[in-house]
Amino acid sequence: MSSCASLGGPVPLPPPGPSAALTSGAPARALHVELPSQQRRLRHLRNIAARNIVNRNGHQLLDTYFTLHLCDNEKIFKEFYRSEVIKNSLNPTWRSLDFGIMPDRLDTSVSCFVVKIWGGKEEAFQLLIEWKVYLDGLKYLGQQIHARNQNEIIFGLNDGYYGAPCEHKGHPNAQKNLLQVDQNCVRNSYDVFSLLRLHRAQCAIKQTQVTVQRLGKEIEEKLRLTSTSNELKKESECLRLKILVLRNELERQKKALGREVAFLHKQQMALQDKGSAFSTEHGKLQLQKDSLSELRKECTAKRELFLKTNAQLTIRCRQLLSELSYIYPIDLNENKDYFVCGVKLPNSEDFQAKDDGSIAVALGYTAHLVSMISFFLQVPLRYPIIHKGSRSTIKDNINDKLTEKEREFPLYPKGGEKLQFDYGVYLLNKNIAQLRYQHGLGTPDLRQTLPNLKNFMEHGLMVRCDRHHISNAIPVPKRQSSTFGGADGGFSAGIPSPDKVHRKRASSENERLQYKTPPPSYNSALTQPGVAMPTSGDSERKVAPLSSSLDTSLDFSKENKKAGVDLGSSVSGDHGNSDSGQEQGEALPGHLAAVNGTALPSEQAGPAGTLLPGSCHPAPSAELCCAVEQAEEIIGLEATGFTSGDQLEALSCIPVDSAVAVECDEQVLGEFEEFSRRIYALSENVSSFRRPRRSSDK
């Protein structure tokens, strides 16, 4: 078959051959019968293949694809299908046709169309074969592709593969119209008797139809004559049925009416009961409204009291936090070193072995400051602090890998336990970071203990941590000095040693109230510096203005034990202390009583009967003031154990004649510096902390 060939005209029948006859033992699917009435359409086409393509381009192999076109007697229309490209093949077999990508209005019932096969290389294709195909004129090739001719196109239909027909010599034209079939498939047609039976059956059916029509007409005529009487009977029966239905409905409605009337009476009785109950409840409601108005007034008063108390609590909390900045001042020197109460505390990674004593003291101050801040802010610390001064510890209750005995870590260097000490300092820094986070402050470096704490107090709590600013004073209520002067018992009775003292707890509600009341403090001593005026022969009783509060308290306790003098008047500033060497009641010049770290001057008369500079001048007419931080220090009396519950009964408030306005805290800070110095000396040499005996020359 050559290119650009066209086949048409009458389609001859194929000669007899193996494709037309069914051989014995062949499968049933191999049966193929050529019928003149068989029609092949475009919708029956499944795939197309080409064999033995002649290449005129000089290439050994070609890239090929085909296109399908509709046509008529005059022209060929635009392609309606294009196949994929088969590369490097002269015997391509393209995929099955996809009718889904063909135009929707494509007429698939046509049996004539044009096939064009294109070939080339690198997108340069040219027409190789063009064939106008009549599907009815194709020859059946079999269930498999067989091709011997050049440029042969094979069409795959539903029952097998078809190709171009070829002329067969040696067969007369008369045999071309013969149909070769199997004898087993041939049978006889109808005979005369069968046709007669069919004719008689048709006649009977016709006669039956005529009879049916006749009977139908008779029935219609009878119905037409009796239609009037039937209508009357129908209406009569309908009326009887309606009467029966209405009677039944009447009985049902009567019964329903009786039930509704009974229910109405029941509802009326219930309504009367509810009306009486409503009247009773209405009266109660009026009483409750009156009570509600009173409760609203009480609630308003309580709300105002709550707001006032809450505001006072907030102010008091800020005052206490401000007091902490006076008790534990954090300073920065020119070398960028931070000190708490005058004790240097480097960052956690800069600790040195030679500074173990000062580090323990500074960490004790810092731990107490952090624990008190958390107590005032009501923020529980994640790692609880056990305050023991310079032997404070901290617990880790979070880490589940630790046993109960291993949860407590020291905040002081302890021999070879350097790792536990470092971890304890780390937990302390974590507590500081927790407080900072509670107030919206970040902690980029945990190692800076005092810088983080100072920054937190100044920016988070709005409290200044240095010791150079002046505190505000608060008014102190007036009180008669005789009330305090008449207290039984002095401080000399039962004063325990500072290192063995334990805090006594209140056993009754009255004692608890007494413990909450701040006792008098060293306010008069802060007003004017205490001047020690020694007498002849009493060189051992010389007291410096900034002496240690601990030593002064011990001396004062020993002297009171010897003399049995009531110290209540000495604290209030109304009476002078009696000297053990002067039995006649002469005033001891220059004697200073120390209470909780502060010297309290007594009334001292000079030789000429005049008051000394250290004496106090009561002013009962004016309401005097003392600093908030000084008033708070009075609570330390009960905390340090220098007084008992009975002695605190007389210290319920600060007497007016001993409370004065204070503008600076130099003496208080001096006391703290002296105490810090002695604590540091204790860490270096325990013997230096002891007070020299009276018999010594010091």
UniProtKB/Swiss-Prot annotation:
Low complexity: compositionally biased ranges: 1-10
UniProt keyword Mitochondrion, yes or no: no
Pfam families with a match to the protein in the record: ATG14, C2
Subcellular location: Late endosome; Lysosome; Cytoplasmic vesicle, Autophagosome; Early endosome
Region (Required for interaction with PRKDC, XRCC6 and XRCC5) residue spans: 442-698
Region listing for Sufficient for interaction with VPS16, required for interaction with CEP63, in residue ranges: 269-441
GO CC annotation, single: early endosome
Record-listed Phosphothreonine modification sites: T517
Predominant localisation class: other
Superkingdom to which the source organism belongs: Eukaryota
A GO molecular function held by the record: SH3 domain binding
SUPFAM superfamilies: C2 domain (Calcium/lipid-binding domain, CaLB) (SSF49562)
Residue stretches making up the C2 domain: 23-149
InterPro entries from the UniProt entry: C2_dom, C2_domain_sf, UV_resistance/autophagy_Atg14
Role: Versatile protein that is involved in regulation of different cellular pathways implicated in membrane trafficking. Involved in regulation of the COPI-dependent retrograde transport from Golgi and the endoplasmic reticulum by associating with the NRZ complex; the function is dependent on its binding to phosphatidylinositol 3-phosphate (PtdIns(3)P). During autophagy acts as a regulatory subunit of the alternative PI3K complex II (PI3KC3-C2) that mediates formation of phosphatidylinositol 3-phosphate and is believed to be involved in maturation of autophagosomes and endocytosis.
Quaternary structure and interacting proteins, as annotated: Component of the PI3K (PI3KC3/PI3K-III/class III phosphatidylinositol 3-kinase) complex II (PI3KC3-C2) in which the core composed of the catalytic subunit PIK3C3, the regulatory subunit PIK3R4 and BECN1 is associated with UVRAG; in the complex interacts directly with BECN1. PI3KC3-C2 can associate with further regulatory subunits such as RUBCN and probably SH3GLB1/Bif-1. Interacts with SH3GLB1; UVRAG bridges the interaction to BECN1 indicative for an association with the PI3K complex PI3KC3-C2. Interacts with RINT1.
Name the record gives this protein: UV radiation resistance-associated protein
Organism the protein comes from: Mus musculus
Gene behind this protein: Uvrag
